């Protein structure tokens, strides 16, 4: 049974100013600050630039955190469907990610140049990234509590757009902390390292505690204002044994019943491939921009801001486009953008050409999550929605194990050939997008009933 929340076309403008929807979307803003500041920018640079390690070390950390998510996603889906409680788990994982992120900065300062800093930092990052991704499973499933099926595209688009506004806020707000542009008392309170005058790009380690605080502050509206709704269609679901046993039993039963949900399973397989490329681009964007294109720290910040600005516009518009033409057609449009972006990025040897790549990547990132999140809602029956959101996450997270490892192995094997390894690595991602597009051919239109 869909939630009965002010159905009708009159909600077009007022939809986004509903307090629960606005509070829910604020978490998109909060977690995207973490994703950009930590996953895409400062942690990979901390590993490769500050500690002087190869890309493959960061690749391992990302992949390990995704292995844990892949293993536990089925259990989270059961918790959503059977207990119908998303909020407590979302808050728990969000706070875990926040604490682990801040700990990287604090412990890093305490250890200084001690050799153990690499392994402690990698361990804390694995925990932070795991918890962040776990929170998204419960967060994505909350969208069904906020509006009718016909409003999913707009609600999803609003969340993604606000999320990328968070990226802009995060990038701008973090700069003075990293470059030493804050008062001494602030540096002492936040346990920041001193920044020597003329230090190019500042101190990467100083990004972690302020990012953790921003993540926390912008998460508070969701923590206090978004409540769980019980769904009558899912009430009364009983299961034998423990949550663990039931979680994996359900996954097995779901795969056995693949014939019943052919369209949805085709989509999950397609999603596995094309999101592999997207997750890898997000993870290595900063490393590629600085290592291959030679962007300075300030140029990288501007590049990311421009990409994010286009992500905001793209995601907001894609919400309306998805509601208008359907999520499947929208996904095709977005994937063609990724094809063009990856080709240009792999051959770009001038700044103007690379800036075009940044714009396309920005539009592609924002639009991808809008259309895919909407399609999974359209294709999944309400009583199994949590289960399928778990599989949706599982598909994306397993792919996030493979992509970074492919990148890391290629760049490691070709490390003696300059930037050729990175260019081949980013071009290799094109194959994953094309496979995903080919598999999408037989995914049904989400507006039709899937049986």
Regions found by a protein language model. Give the residues of each.
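Juxtamembrane intracellular "pre-TM" segments in multi-pass secondary transporters
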Residues: 2-21, 227-268
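Helix-loop boundary and gating motifs at the non-cytosolic
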Residues: 8-70, 263-303
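Helix-to-loop junctions at the C-terminal end of transmembrane segments
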Residues: 71-85, 313-327, 411
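Structural signature of the two symmetry-related core transmembrane helices
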Residues: 88-103, 329-344
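Hydrophobic core of transmembrane alpha-helices in multi-pass small-molecule transporters
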Residues: 100, 107, 113-135, 353-367
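Multi-pass alpha-helical transporter architecture, strongest
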Residues: 106-108, 214-225, 427-451
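Intracellular juxtamembrane helix-capping segments at the cytosolic ends
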Residues: 134-147, 367-381
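A membrane-interface helix-boundary motif in multi-pass transporters
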Residues: 178-213, 409-433
């Amino acid at each position: 049974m869909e939630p009965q929340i002010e159905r009708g076309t009159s909600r077009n403008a007022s939809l986004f100013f509903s307090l629960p929807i606005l509070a829910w979307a604020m978490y998109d803003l909060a977690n995207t600050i973490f994703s950009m500041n930590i996953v895409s920018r400062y942690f990979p640079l901390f590993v490769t630039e500050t500690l002087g390690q190869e890309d493959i070390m960061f690749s391992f950390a990302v992949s390990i955190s995704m292995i844990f998510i892949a293993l536990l996603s089925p259990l989270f889906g059961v918790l959503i469907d059977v207990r119908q409680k998303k909020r407590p788990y979302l808050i728990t994982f969000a706070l875990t990610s926040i604490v682990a992120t801040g700990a990287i900065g604090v412990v890093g300062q305490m250890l200084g140049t001690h050799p153990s800093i690499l392994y402690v930092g990698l361990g804390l990052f694995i925990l932070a990234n795991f918890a962040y991704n776990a929170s998204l499973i419960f967060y994505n499933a909350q969208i069904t509590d906020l509006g009718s099926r016909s409003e999913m595209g707009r609600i999803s688009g609003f969340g993604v757009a606000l999320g990328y506004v968070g990226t802009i806020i995060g990038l701008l707000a973090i700069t003075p902390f990293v470059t030493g542009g804050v008062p001494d008392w602030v540096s002492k309170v936040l346990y920041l390292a001193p920044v020597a005058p003329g230090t190019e790009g500042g101190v990467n380690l100083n990004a972690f505690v302020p990012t953790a605080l921003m993540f926390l502050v912008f998460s508070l509206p969701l923590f206090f204002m978004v409540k769980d709704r019980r769904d009558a269609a899912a009430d009364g679901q009983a299961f034998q044994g423990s949550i663990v046993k039931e979680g994996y039993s359900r996954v097995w039963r779901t795969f056995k019943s693949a014939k019943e949900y052919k369209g949805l399973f085709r989509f999950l397989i397609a999603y596995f491939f094309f999101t592999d490329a997207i997750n890898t681009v997000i993870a290595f964007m900063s490393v590629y921009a600085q290592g291959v294109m030679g962007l300075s720290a300030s140029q990288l910040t501007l590049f990311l801001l421009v990409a994010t600005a286009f992500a905001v516009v793209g995601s907001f518009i894609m919400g309306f486009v998805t509601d208008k033409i359907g999520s499947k057609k929208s996904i095709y449009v977005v994937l063609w953008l990724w094809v063009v972006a990856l080709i240009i990025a792999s051959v770009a040897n001038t700044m103007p050409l690379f800036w075009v790549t940044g714009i396309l990547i920005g539009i592609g990132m924002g639009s991808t999550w809008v259309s895919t999140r909407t399609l999974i809602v359209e294709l999944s029956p309400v009583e199994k929605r949590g289960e399928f959101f778990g599989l949706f996450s599982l598909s994306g997270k397993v792919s996030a194990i493979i992509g970074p490892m492919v990148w890391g192995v290629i760049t490691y094997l070709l490390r003696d050939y300059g930037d050729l390894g990175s260019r081949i690595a980013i071009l290799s991602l094109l194959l994953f997008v094309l496979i995903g597009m080919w598999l999408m051919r037989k995914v049904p239109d989400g507006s039709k009933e899937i049986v």
